[in-house]
Amino acid sequence: MEAPRGNLRAVALIAGDNNVRGCLQFVQDISGTTHVTGKISGLSPGFHGFHIHSFGDTTNGCISTGPHFNPLNRVHGPPNEEERHAGDLGNILAGSNGVAEILIKDKHIPLSGQYSILGRAVVVHADPDDLGKGGHKLSKSTGNAGSRVGCGIIGLQSSADAKL
């Protein structure tokens, strides 16, 4: 999986419960869209909520990453709609081998500017994200995606280190 060429690059090393591990690369292209690529292993097969959370703090595991990144104070929603948290990236799918291959393009998670995601955390949840449409009391805030099974801090990457 080759990420597009761009000026800004970031990386997140994912760690968590039950040997959940991964490496994600973030590349902001010249149009401002951020491309997220990589793999996460150790997941249960099926869909898992996938979000950018507000804080790059893992001192208390993934719980200390705070809520979804939401600088515009919107309700939770699917990644293809404007009414959503900036950090709402929907779901990733882990195959029967427990590996999810990530290939996401999103204009709401820039690596620069006022709403940059640098220094924040990416989080994988135990359950599917209902995209704000599940009718559960947590649907409009978390997508009712369950516990946090893995996370990593999004850090600026040197262009010399871009080949992971």
Curated annotation (Swiss-Prot):
Residues that coordinate or bind Zn(2+): 68, 76, 85, 88
Cofactor(s) needed, names only, are:
Cu cation; Zn(2+)
The protein's UniProt keywords, in alphabetical order, are: Antioxidant, Copper, Disulfide bond, Metal-binding, Oxidoreductase, Peroxisome, Zinc
- Whether Disulfide bond counts among this entry's keywords is yes
Cystine links in this protein are 62-151
Q: In which tissues is it expressed?
A: Expressed in leaves (at protein level).
Where does this chain carry the motif Peroxisome localization signal? 162-164
Q: What is this protein called?
A: Superoxide dismutase [Cu-Zn] 3
> What is the species listed in this Swiss-Prot or TrEMBL entry?
Arabidopsis thaliana
Print the organism lineage: Eukaryota, Viridiplantae, Streptophyta, Embryophyta, Tracheophyta
Q: Which gene encodes it?
A: CSD3
